[in-house]
């Protein structure tokens, strides 16, 4: 696990709960003058899968990108409020974003392997944050590729370009690359939307295994996937959090009519 002074100062007013990995409080987000997220407050339980559902443009992916400050890469975007991680608000301007993004990994909708070998895709982020010798790096590469069920498929071609892998293999490689830096939180933005059913099933099985170690937040438009994979489900609509509950209760007895209408296909 990567540690740094960016996360060691704990405000007694927001001391970290061992049961909550991310605590969002009164979060608002703006694309220029467009108010995209409105007063979002939600807890992400540690070592659980939280699925975020809702129609396109409702703010799910925007929220995901707030957690590791990806929005900082684009001018005119800003967030207010709090996202408490390890006792500190990640929106603070003096945060070390390289360390934050190593501890809060992200996998995108479309597989994005780096234009380098399979081995170097895994080693790239590790080299930025740790000084491992070759044997240690080899072990790290094998470990994460094994964990995403990719090792046996690529062990004899680690030096081959990652672009030669299938779409499903590339996405598993991207997950392996994200967990290679040993983050505490893993963010996934529709990670299976571009994959075939077999590859999708493999990713879903993988999530069930990974949540034993990582806190996972996943954006999905597939409500069957949310029901299969998630412990907690949050429904968003027009930039607002409408309801959050356990997956079982959300899909069998939602409290809000908007939630009921969405999950039954009346809109969205």
From Swiss-Prot:
It catalyses: phosphate(out) + ATP + H2O = ADP + 2 phosphate(in) + H(+). Its main location: membrane. Keywords: ATP-binding, Cell inner membrane, Cell membrane, Membrane, Nucleotide-binding, Phosphate transport, Translocase, Transport. GO terms for cellular component: plasma membrane. It is a peripheral membrane protein. Its EC number is 7.3.2.1. ATP binds at residues 54-61. Transmembrane segments: none annotated. GO terms for molecular function: ATP binding; ATP hydrolysis activity; ATPase-coupled phosphate ion transmembrane transporter activity. It is an enzyme of class 7 (translocase). The keyword Membrane applies. One of its GO terms (biological process) is phosphate ion transmembrane transport. It comes from the Bacteria. InterPro entries: AAA+_ATPase, ABC_transporter-like_ATP-bd, ABC_transporter-like_CS, P-loop_NTPase, PstB-like. Part of the ABC transporter complex PstSACB involved in phosphate import. Responsible for energy coupling to the transport system. The complex is composed of two ATP-binding proteins (PstB), two transmembrane proteins (PstC and PstA) and a solute-binding protein (PstS). Belongs to the ABC transporter superfamily. Phosphate importer (TC 3.A.1.7) family. This is Phosphate import ATP-binding protein PstB. The gene is pstB.
């Amino acid at each position: 696990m990567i540690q740094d002074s960016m996360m060691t100062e704990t405000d007694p007013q927001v001391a970290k709960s061992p049961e909550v990995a991310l605590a969002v409080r009164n979060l608002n987000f703006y694309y220029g003058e467009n108010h995209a997220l409105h007063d979002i407050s939600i807890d992400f339980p540690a070592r659980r899968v939280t699925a975020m559902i809702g129609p396109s443009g409702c703010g799910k992916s925007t929220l995901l990108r707030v957690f590791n400050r990806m929005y900082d890469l684009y001018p005119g975007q800003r967030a207010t409020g709090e996202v408490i991680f390890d006792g500190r608000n990640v929106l603070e301007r003096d945060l070390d974003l390289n360390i934050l993004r190593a501890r809060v990994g992200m996998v995108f909708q479309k597989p994005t392997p780096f234009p380098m070998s399979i081995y170097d895709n895994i080693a790239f982020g590790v080299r930025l944050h740790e000084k491992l010798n070759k044997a240690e790096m080899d072990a790290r590469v094998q470990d994460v590729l094994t964990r995403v069920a990719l090792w046996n498929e690529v062990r004899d071609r680690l030096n081959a370009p990652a672009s030669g892998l299938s779409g499903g293999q590339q996405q598993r490689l991207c997950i392996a690359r994200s967990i290679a830096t040993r983050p505490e939180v893993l963010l996934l933005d529709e990670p299976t939307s571009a994959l075939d059913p077999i590859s999708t099933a493999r990713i879903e099985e993988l999530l069930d295994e990974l949540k034993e170690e990582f806190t996972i937040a996943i954006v999905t438009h597939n409500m069957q996937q949310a029901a299969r994979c998630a412990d907690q489900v949050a429904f968003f609509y027009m930039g607002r959090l409408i309801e959050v509950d356990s997956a079982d209760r959300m899909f069998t007895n939602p409290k809000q009519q908007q939630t009921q209408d969405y999950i039954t296909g009346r809109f969205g």
